[in-house]
Amino acid sequence: MEPGPSVSPGPSRSFKEELLCAVCYDPFRDAVTLRCGHNFCRRCVSGCWEVQTTPSCPVCKERAVPGELRTNHTLNNLVETLLREEAEGARWTGRRSPRPCRAHRAPLTLFCVEDKELLCCACQADARHQEHRVQPIKDTAQDFRAKCKNMEHVLREKAKSFWALRRTYEAIAKHNEVQTTWLEGRIRDEFDKLRDFLRVEEQATVDAMKEESRKKHLLAEEKMKQLAEQTEALAREIERLQMEMKEDDMTFLMKHKSRKRRLFCTVEPAPLQPGLLMDACKYLESLQYRVWKKMLGSVESVPFSLDPNTAAGWLKVADDLTSVINHGYRVQVENPERFSSAPCLLGSQVFSKGSHSWEVDVGGLPSWRVGVVRVQAHAQAQAQADVGGEGHSHSCYHDTRSGFWYLCRTQGVDGDHCMTSDTATAPLVQAMPRRLRVELECEEGELSFYDSERHCHLYTFHAHFGEVRPYFYLGASRGDGPPEPLRICHLRVSIKEELDI
């Protein structure tokens, strides 16, 4: 028998691993070199960069520039040579050398799908694999490679989701930086207003005290001047009297009648005038309380604020957080609390106990909702809206059955109607309310709506509400004019003074 051609020993394992891409772990295909010196398949490194915001090396993470990829001809030639040797019978396949079956020393040509084991023909006859599905290695490898390809696609999509989420967190961080600066300015402005008010009140109180001191000082000086003049007049009279007493008896007695009349008309000393001391009580008595009461007259208070973190992209909340307009959709920082499928937002407070009331000025808005939403229902509605995508209707999931209780203005073929979130309820009134009063009795399970201008009851819901937050919907304005706002009305603050017993 004629000997076959001699086969040179294959390359070492470490050398073969140097020719594997660090991304796909296959021999290089169109090898390229990055600026950092690492090598990859061109397709692999490009695929990694598709899901990165900033291209970087998959191994060392050094920043990379896609335009600076250099084709590595040496690596490509080495891989081509070794693959050609494989085709000619070389032992290297790019992964591991074929191994025979340990039990039968026969070539492994089959694969048990149930046990996930490589088999030879003798293993197939074993009782352990009699009822199992067995396929040729080549066919199984092809099927598994297809599954891995699908898995690779799933992983790439997951990586894209991770990078998108990372970009969202980056946007949130930047938003918070801007918001922190803005909030610091607003907080300082509000405290400056309080300090200005206190400075004005302090100066007014000090000025009033000094004015009283000036007047009382002038009065005391005037009294002292009068007393000085009267004292001087008495001194002259005393001197005259002394001179008359030195006269001879006849002359002295002749002047006695006029002297007596003159002495009788001298001024008597007036009693000390009351109220000349500074009135400390007038200025110090409950000073802080009196200033605080006066401050209440200039301070505006609302039962709650409009939460901008829940406002959908259509809405813009005013800086004082008491009014909102619909200015058309604009991209906002994503967060789980924000409405995504409708121009809605929530109030800042959570109500679960006690009695609460507030008034809302809806004016002539063509489309609105005012009411409450169960906290858990809001979270569930947001999750369902996210699953449904942007194509959802503005009214999706926002009804009484899903934990939303409200009055709304809707547009119909025969005009506008005032409706409730209960679809089984008929239209309430013909005259559209412009200012609504909402009264929530948590323990009683009642949510009532009133027309504040007409002083009439509109509707009452009866339910176990649980934890709720004020809920609002604001449709787009009609016409080309500036958008009309929805406002939370200010409270009328009163003070009740009681004796602490």
UniProtKB/Swiss-Prot annotation:
EC primary class: transferase
SUPFAM superfamilies: B-box zinc-binding domain, Concanavalin A-like lectins/glucanases, RING/U-box
Family matches, as Gene3D superfamilies: 2.60.120.920, Classic Zinc Finger, Zinc/RING finger domain, C3HC4 (zinc finger)
Zn finger intervals (B box-type): 96-137
Domain of life: Eukaryota
Compartments, as annotated in UniProt: Cytoplasm; Nucleus
Binding sites annotated in the UniProt record for Zn(2+): 101, 104, 123, 129
GO CC, alphabetical: cytoplasm; nucleus
Entry EC number(s): 2.3.2.27
Sorted UniProt keywords: Acetylation, Apoptosis, Coiled coil, Cytoplasm, Metal-binding, Nucleus, Phosphoprotein, Transferase, Ubl conjugation pathway, Zinc, Zinc-finger
Substrates-to-products reaction catalysed: S-ubiquitinyl-[E2 ubiquitin-conjugating enzyme]-L-cysteine + [acceptor protein]-L-lysine = [E2 ubiquitin-conjugating enzyme]-L-cysteine + N(6)-ubiquitinyl-[acceptor protein]-L-lysine
GO biological process: innate immune response; myeloid cell apoptotic process; negative regulation of cell population proliferation; negative regulation of mitotic cell cycle; positive regulation of apoptotic process; positive regulation of myeloid cell apoptotic process; protein ubiquitination; suppression of viral release by host
Coiled coil feature spans: 209-252
Zn finger limits (RING-type): 21-61
Pfam families attached to this UniProt entry: PRY, SPRY, zf-B_box, zf-RING_UBOX
Domain free text: The RING finger domain and the coiled-coil region are required for the apoptosis-inducing activity.
Protein name per the record: E3 ubiquitin-protein ligase TRIM35
Gene name in the database record: Trim35
